[in-house]
Amino acid sequence: MLKGSLYKDIVRFMLEKSGYYVSPYGYDSSLSELKFKFTEETRNSKTGRRIRFSPDLLVYDDQNVMLVEVKMRGKSPPMIRASEIKNVKEFWNDSVLVVVVPEGNVFYAQRISELEIQESDYYQLSDFEKFQDIFTRVQAEDISYYKGIALQNMKIK
């Protein structure tokens, strides 16, 4: 299993346990066969780029439907490149970015539409909210449980 995929699964399990319906979505799951078929020309077309930057998960409950991109950063402070946000913002401005990091709450999230385009190279963790502030069904004990799993897999205790 790829490292990034593990953290997508951790986020998925936590959301499902909290009562959200979660389905894999996008380039790394339902469209993964396209990775090997794109030419450079199709990969860099507007539609090709939209597909490549598609979010990882479709998350919904009886009140919300969200597209969610999950990123893991194993170093502290986490480096979230502005160019990554710019690409997601261009095509998926209504999505949510979840960042899994080896510090604090471990799980953070922000609506892409609320992240301002900036001149600096990186976004700071302070630009994000605690995961449970965006995904309000998630309970503190679930954050604690999945935080332990995430940190163990990051080899940080």
Across the structure, where does each feature detected by a protein language model lie?
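Short, structured active-site "lid" loops
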Residues: 39-66
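Acidic-basic catalytic patches of nuclease active cores, encompassing PD-(D/E)XK
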Residues: 1-46
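Catalytic cores of nucleic-acid endonucleases
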Residues: 9, 18, 23, 50-52, ...
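Glycine-rich, aromatic-bearing surface loops/beta-hairpins
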Residues: 105-157
